[in-house]
Amino acid sequence: MAGLRRGAAAVAPAGTAGFGRPGRPQGRRQQELGKQRAAPRPGPRSKEKKKVNCKPKNQDEQEIPFRLREIMRSRQEMKNPISNKKRKKEAQAAFSKTLEKEAKGVEPDIAIPKFKQRKWESDRAYVRRMEQEAQHVLFLSKNQANRQPEVQAAPKKEKSERKKAFQKRRLDKARQRREEKAAERLEQELLQDTVKFGEVVLQPPELTAKPRMSVSRDQPGKKSLMLKKLLSPGSVSQPLTTSLARQRIVAEERERAVNAYRALKRLQQQRQETQSPQPPHLPPGKKPEMQL
């Protein structure tokens, strides 16, 4: 035992006076560590002690208040585009990490231990360590909330009939607007006239389409009068289509009227012959003499 203590004392550094013996160099090191811990962390966001009603160190110089310094620092960061870009980049990285976690799903709370015998670890210590970790995992699994991994996710809630009808009406209106726009675009394309290079126009175009809200009025000289129809050269009255019986009756009436007219003319001629005197009979070749 004395040899082991001497070996430990020989292995220990010169600054320490053994494992349990407090010495002067060890106390100095503890003082240095205490000073390092007491010193504030470097950086603009270090916590400063609030001094209330304290006498200034220098009477000629007055320190800037803490709040004012914070406001000035925040304004300086806003003016500096590099810090803003860095802040945005950090926010984007954090957001992407959260999205990845949500995509992967909830990680298991209990980590599965992996056993491997360490270097210079005895078999007994290795078995004891495995038993401790196994007991710890069993304890965590017992106190963990009940899980149901075999249960499937709840089906999505179907849309109500009212919502379906509303979406259908909205889709119909959108389709109708698209059709109206397409018709208007086609109408604009039809109304647009493409004039070729070197084309000659003899007269302005005639507008045949009427305005929507206009009242149709006949212009002077363009009224459809009966006299214009009669005087027009191409206006020939077309015979009306009648039946065969009607045509036979009309033909008989026409023939009777013609026969009556001929009989009347013959009777008038006979009366004239009886009333007028007959001229004297002259030999052929002689003309009647004229008396003065």
Curated annotation (Swiss-Prot):
Annotated GO CC locations: chromosome; nucleolus; nucleoplasm; nucleus
Highest rank taxon of the organism: Eukaryota
InterPro entries: CCDC137
Biased composition (Polar residues): 234-243
Record key words, sorted: Chromosome, Coiled coil, Phosphoprotein
Ranges of biased composition (kind: Basic and acidic residues): 57-78, 155-164, 173-183
Protein name according to UniProt: Coiled-coil domain-containing protein 137
Source organism: Bos taurus (Bovine)
